[in-house]
């Protein structure tokens, strides 16, 4: 995680390498839900996280906590679905390798609550906090291929913001994943995900928001109903 938190005009730099990420993550959770009918689908992707850290200076101690909520809702359409190779016959079913491509549009809701606590050696403690929320429109693409019955790979990415209303000037997200089918209805996966956005706005003491680049490995499971 790297970026800048701006609260009432006060800017604090954030730079947390992956090996230190668990030390500053106070809580975190991700959830993805998708419903599909033929080529159409709708999906929800949610991230809840609370990050925090502290540093001691010669004249002042600094404590930073950032509560982050990111929810996106998208609707998409499958533009490509093609069989790859010959069918594979199993004892109870026949399976066909496929390559697929989906396109989608949606909206991503950001809510960040940075709290900065300044504790000088001389004088009173000072706490600066704000709440910044906005919705970014976005459009994107997702592709997936079956390498075998067990192994699948997928890529997805989107761009958004575009400076529409209160939206960020530009935001983007990309992810690559490899999955293993445990059964016809259960898949486990691992991958890498990057999310970059800038919600800083205003001038002087009214300048608030967060500019953040989050990236790192992801692991999870998928269940088909």
Describe the function of each predicted region.
Residues 1-48, 214-225:
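Short glycine/proline- and aromatic-enriched beta-strand/turn motifs that initiate or cap beta-hairpins
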């Amino acid at each position: 995680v790297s970026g800048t938190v701006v609260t009432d005009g006060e800017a604090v730099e954030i730079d947390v390498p992956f090996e230190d990420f668990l030390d500053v993550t106070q809580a975190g959770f991700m959830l993805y839900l998708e419903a599909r009918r033929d080529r159409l689908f709708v999906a929800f992707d949610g991230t809840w996280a609370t990050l925090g850290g502290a540093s001691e200076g010669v004249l002042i101690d600094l404590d930073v906590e950032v509560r982050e909520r990111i929810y996106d809702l998208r609707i998409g359409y499958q533009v490509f679905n093609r069989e790859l190779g010959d069918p594979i016959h199993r004892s109870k079913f026949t399976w066909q390798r496929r390559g697929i491509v989906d396109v989608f549009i949606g909206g991503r809701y950001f809510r960040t609550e940075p709290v900065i606590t300044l504790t000088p050696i001389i004088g009173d403690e000072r706490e600066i906090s704000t709440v910044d929320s906005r919705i970014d429109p976005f459009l994107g693409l997702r592709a997936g291929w079956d390498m075998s019955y067990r192994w699948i790979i997928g890529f997805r990415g989107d761009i958004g913001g575009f400076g529409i209303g209160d939206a960020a000037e530009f935001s983007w997200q990309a992810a690559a994943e490899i999955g293993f089918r445990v059964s016809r209805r259960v898949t486990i996966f691992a991958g890498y995900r990057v999310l970059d956005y800038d919600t800083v706005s205003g001038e002087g003491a009214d300048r608030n928001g967060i500019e953040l680049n989050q990236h790192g490995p992801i692991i999870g499971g998928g269940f088909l109903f």
